[in-house]
Amino acid sequence: IIKSVAKICVYGNGKSYFLWNNALAYYKKLNHLFEDIKSDTPKDYLYPCFITLCSATLEYSLNLIYVLYCFRHFEYEDYKSYLETYRNMCFKNKLFMFPYIISEGKLIINEDSQEIKSLYELITKRNGLLHNSEKLRTFDVPDINASIINDKLVIPSENSQIHILLSAEDNIIDSITKDDCIRIGNVIFSFYKQILHPYVNDDELNICDFIKSKN
């Protein structure tokens, strides 16, 4: 089990610091939702909720990794400056850069792995859910041989009715499936076991399904 208190530093200057770790709270709630989704009863309304919680859990995990890295390697004054830089990266870049930063250039993300591809897909779905909006779309109007006579629009009787077919695009909230959730959920829990748990508890980051050697 991952430690709740990730780091404590005691200094003789009257100031001491500790770093609290709430990752387990995220993963516990995610696991409860995961079990509901895997059940036989269809619950498609939970799918977008699951994707949102998965992305929140992943980003919290990445932020915790960066916080721990800065806490372990920099004095408090420098820690804040470095951490601000890392936390201001976009979500995908946080994922892409963390093994290179943590390992000081020895490890990189394995973009060929299905695990990383699933995490990239998760981020894309999350962005689609949380930042979705509608846009104007074009359609073709058939020629109805209309004319202007005495400042009035005149349409031939045979064209008084026209049929226009409007095609709708798939909405992200309806496109998420149970299989998507199960696949992405399994990857998130693998991230916990292979990366977050060993790094938080033992300060270790190793080659795994998500990470490969730079060379």
Give, region by region, the residue ranges found by the protein language model.
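Surface-exposed polar/charged interaction patches
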Residues: 8-11, 33-40, 68-71, 89, ...
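Amphipathic alpha-helices that form helix-helix packing interfaces
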Residues: 23-26, 30, 58-64, 122-129, ...
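Charged alpha-helical initiation segments
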Residues: 1-48
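Amphipathic, Lys/Arg-enriched alpha-helical patches that create a basic surface
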Residues: 123-128, 141-215
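Glycine-rich, flexible loop segments associated with nucleotide phosphate handling
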Residues: 42-50, 86, 116, 149-157
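Flexible secondary-structure boundary motifs
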Residues: 63, 67-151, 164
